[in-house]
């Protein structure tokens, strides 16, 4: 239930406004305190009086109409909200938000918001597929907004396709799940080890070779795991990120050998190990004591294989849940499932690093989770922190099942 949760519903101008009326009613029935902001266009479809009657609060329609002279309306509304839902969100309002435009009560309030913002698009199927709209949605994902994907069906314009505002009862369920997860700690008492970032393999005192990993996915997982109640040890290669707050231990490493040593030192005491680090497969056979000087002609650098840490953990595994990552460029499912089986993993998270919004350094990701029992779960583009929560919820469920069987 949503007892005493403050939900700010922002309604922009589209035919789906009628569904926003039902959403207001269902949120109130679930126990939420609901306030509504309407754009000028939204008021052309439904009277503000309708939302006032359903929410039992006066409706915001004008930035310059200060309902309470002791506060500034758009700041007060933003501070009041525990959750903000923009439904329906038109292409116009999505474009404004993506570009920081604040020219009405809705957009001005969202610029001042610190609560989570969910955007529920509703528009013609071709508008939703337009490159400009997709670009704006991608920007908002990177800014930390969450999206409630539109459903497919008959649209008011006569087309059949993706663009229908999600059903109000489903949005309410998502809100209930959000607040339930916020107050729960499904990983409480669990010892979680997460590896992140690249490794550096020294050639000489000046040079090394590495990879494009930035550590963002691993650090997001560590942050989320702490929030879900876990005791988190983060083992990180060299990155330019701040340590997540609340870690039990932070272990910085440089090379693949360092990473292996650190992981093995904490493995036996762990309940869950998540290996997001991009560990080098090869390292120089000889590390030069002094800087190598330029020479005429070419140069041959002899390499040797590093130890496959994930495979070694799979062989040593007792009751731990072992999670791997697969950053691929082709045949994603084939290589992910092969790695899942070969390394005795419980699940593996795979992505196509060439896809827009899913590569190294991006703040978003598009992943598929493959499970040991053969099923998979595809996630849409979302922030790496949101991806982390989804992954960890799956791990928590798996941990619970494992505990019930043992």
Swiss-Prot record:
Q: Which UniProt keywords apply?
A: Decarboxylase, Flavoprotein, FMN, Ligase, Lyase, Magnesium, Metal-binding, Multifunctional enzyme
Q: Which cofactor does it need?
A: Mg(2+); FMN
Query: What pathway is it annotated to?
Result: Cofactor biosynthesis; coenzyme A biosynthesis; CoA from (R)-pantothenate: step 2/5; Cofactor biosynthesis; coenzyme A biosynthesis; CoA from (R)-pantothenate: step 3/5
Q: Where is this region: Phosphopantothenate--cysteine ligase?
A: 192-406
Q: Which reaction does it catalyse?
A: N-[(R)-4-phosphopantothenoyl]-L-cysteine + H(+) = (R)-4'-phosphopantetheine + CO2; (R)-4'-phosphopantothenate + L-cysteine + CTP = N-[(R)-4-phosphopantothenoyl]-L-cysteine + CMP + diphosphate + H(+)
- Keyword Hydrolase annotated: no
GO CC aspect terms: phosphopantothenoylcysteine decarboxylase complex
Q: Where is the active site?
A: 157 (proton donor)
Lineage, top-rank taxon, reads Bacteria
Question: What EC number(s) is this enzyme filed under?
Answer: 4.1.1.36, 6.3.2.5
One MF annotation (Gene Ontology) recorded for this entry: FMN binding
* Region span, Phosphopantothenoylcysteine decarboxylase: 1-191
Q: Which annotated residues bind CTP?
A: 281, 291, 325, 339, 343
What InterPro entries does the record tag this protein with?
CoaB-like_sf, CoaBC, DNA/pantothenate-metab_flavo_C, Flavin_trans-like, Flavoprotein
Q: Which GO terms describe its biological process?
A: coenzyme A biosynthetic process; pantothenate catabolic process
Q: Does the keyword Membrane apply?
A: no
Question: What family, per the record?
Answer: In the N-terminal section; belongs to the HFCD (homo-oligomeric flavin containing Cys decarboxylase) superfamily. In the C-terminal section; belongs to the PPC synthetase family.
HAMAP family with a match to the protein in the record: CoaBC
Q: What does this protein do?
A: Catalyzes two sequential steps in the biosynthesis of coenzyme A. In the first step cysteine is conjugated to 4'-phosphopantothenate to form 4-phosphopantothenoylcysteine. In the second step the latter compound is decarboxylated to form 4'-phosphopantotheine.
State the protein's name. Answer: Coenzyme A biosynthesis bifunctional protein CoaBC
- Organism in which the protein naturally occurs: Bacillus subtilis (strain 168)
Question: From which lineage does this chain's organism come?
Answer: Bacteria, Bacillati, Bacillota, Bacilli, Bacillales
Q: What's the gene?
A: coaBC
């Amino acid at each position: 239930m949503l007892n005493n949760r403050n939900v700010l519903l922002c309604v922009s101008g589209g035919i789906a406004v009628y569904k926003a009326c039902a959403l207001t009613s269902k949120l109130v029935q679930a126990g939420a305190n609901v306030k509504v902001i309407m754009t000028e266009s939204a008021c052309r479809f439904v009277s503000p009086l309708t939302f006032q009657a359903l929410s039992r609060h006066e409706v915001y329609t004008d930035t310059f109409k200060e309902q309470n002279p002791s506060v500034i309306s758009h700041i007060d509304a933003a501070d009041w909200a525990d959750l903000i839902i923009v439904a329906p969100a038109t292409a116009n309002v999505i474009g404004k938000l993506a570009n920081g435009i604040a020219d009405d009560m809705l957009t001005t309030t969202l610029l001042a918001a610190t609560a989570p913002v969910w955007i529920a698009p509703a528009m013609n199927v071709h508008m939703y597929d337009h490159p400009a709209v997709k670009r704006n949605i991608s920007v908002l994902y990177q800014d930390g907004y969450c999206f409630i994907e539109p459903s497919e069906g008959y649209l008011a314009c006569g087309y059949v396709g993706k663009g229908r505002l999600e059903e109000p009862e489903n949005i309410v369920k998502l809100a209930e799940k959000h607040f339930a997860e916020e107050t729960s700690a499904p990983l409480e008492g669990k010892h979680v080890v997460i590896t992140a970032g690249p490794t550096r393999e020294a050639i000489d005192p000046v040079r090394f070779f590495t990879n494009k990993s930035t550590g963002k996915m691993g650090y997001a997982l560590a942050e989320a795991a702490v929030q879900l109640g876990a005791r988190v040890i983060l083992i990180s290669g060299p990155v330019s990120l701040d340590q997540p707050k609340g870690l039990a231990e932070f272990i910085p490493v440089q090379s693949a050998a360092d990473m292996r040593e650190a992981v093995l030192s904490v493995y036996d005491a762990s309940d869950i190990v998540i290996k997001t680090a991009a560990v080098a497969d090869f390292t120089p056979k000889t590390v030069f004591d002094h800087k190598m000087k330029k020479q005429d002609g070419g140069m041959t650098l002899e390499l040797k294989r590093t130890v496959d840490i994930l495979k070694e953990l799979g062989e040593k595994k007792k009751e731990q849940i072992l999670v791997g990552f697969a950053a691929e460029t082709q045949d994603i499912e084939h290589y992910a499932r092969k790695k899942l089986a070969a390394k005795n993993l419980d699940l593996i998270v795979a992505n196509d690093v060439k896809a827009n919004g899913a590569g190294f350094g991006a703040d978003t990701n598009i992943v598929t989770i493959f499970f040991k029992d053969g099923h998979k779960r595809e996630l849409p583009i979302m922030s790496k922190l949101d991806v982390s929560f989804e992954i960890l919820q799956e791990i928590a469920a798996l941990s619970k099942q494992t505990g019930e069987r043992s």
